[in-house]
């Protein structure tokens, strides 16, 4: 047997990312086919809300102590930092940013491309825009706890997210 060389971090990341999306696509297609979409979203939201403190780390407690404008900016900064898990900064563009609203565009989205490729390869009956809307509903409810409103939609190969400070 030939000596197997260690995968690079980039190769590992790419394979893990593909596996994550494949698992997500399978779950959503199954849930949709079984008519369990509402239950799945309800369950996902419950789990994510419990995990929010560990997902956001120390920022979770800290963000609620700040003035609304500063908390909003910290939240948006956190999205940029954590968002690099699915989108490189090179595809991320801040269309507008104030202490009350942020419009973020992920141009030529790596994540959208991966989802489209995997949905096509698997042949599963899943519409990416429909999936995105469901994903957006769960995200919207999570950020409401922080006093923010969030919407997201797909425009061709880009995803646009708008986050607003309520009040």
What are these regions (language model features)?
Residues 158-162:
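A beta-hairpin/wing motif
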Residues 135:
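Active-site glycine-rich loop that binds ribose-phosphate moieties when present
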Residues 1-131, 141-144, 149-156, 166-167:
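N-terminal accessory segment detector
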């Amino acid at each position: 047997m030939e000596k197997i060389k260690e995968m690079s971090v980039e190769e590992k990341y790419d394979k893990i990312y593909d596996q994550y999306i494949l698992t997500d696509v399978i779950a959503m297609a199954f849930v949709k086919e079984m008519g369990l979409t509402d239950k799945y979203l309800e369950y996902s939201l419950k789990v994510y809300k419990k995990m929010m403190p560990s997902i956001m780390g120390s920022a979770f407690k800290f963000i609620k102590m700040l003035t609304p404008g500063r908390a909003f900016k910290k939240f948006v900064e956190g999205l940029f930092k954590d968002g690099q898990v699915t989108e490189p900064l090179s595809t991320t563009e801040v269309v507008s940013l104030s202490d009350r609203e942020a419009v973020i565009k992920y141009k030529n989205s790596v994540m959208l491309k991966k989802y489209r490729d995997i949905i096509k390869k698997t042949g599963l009956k899943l519409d990416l825009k429909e999936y995105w809307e469901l994903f957006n509903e769960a995200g919207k409810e999570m950020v409401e706890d922080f006093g923010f409103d969030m919407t997201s939609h797909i425009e061709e190969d880009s995803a646009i997210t708008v986050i607003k400070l309520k009040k």
